């Protein structure tokens, strides 16, 4: 299967290989419910806590940076 490079900019999609621009309508959709409030809980995707403390990483010096 061939890989296609696509560039996304606003409501336009252009295929880099063919230079063909397609226009898609931008439709805003909203839905309100007055009877029940829906609460979505974000999942962490089983991420583990970081191995390094953030303050420790900030305290490290990099001699190659300057």
UniProtKB/Swiss-Prot annotation:
Where this protein primarily resides, as one coarse class? plastid
One GO cellular component this record assigns the protein to is: chloroplast
Annotated organelle transit peptide span: 1-25
Which tissues carry this protein?
Expressed exclusively in flowers.
Asked if the keyword ATP-binding belongs to this entry, the reply reads no
Where does the record say this protein resides?
Plastid, Chloroplast
Keywords of this entry: Chloroplast, Plastid, Transit peptide
- Stated induction or repression of this protein's expression: By coronalon.
The family assignment reads: Belongs to the terpene synthase family. Tpsb subfamily.
Give the protein name, as stated in the record.
Answer: Putative inactive (E)-beta-ocimene synthase, chloroplastic
């Amino acid at each position: 299967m061939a890989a296609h490079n696509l560039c996304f900019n606003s409501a336009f999609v252009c295929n880099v290989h063919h230079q063909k621009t397609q226009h898609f309508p931008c439709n805003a959709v909203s839905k309100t419910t007055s009877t029940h409030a829906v609460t979505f809980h974000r999942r962490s995707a089983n991420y583990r806590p970081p191995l390094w403390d953030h303050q420790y990483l900030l305290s490290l010096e990099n001699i190659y940076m300057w």
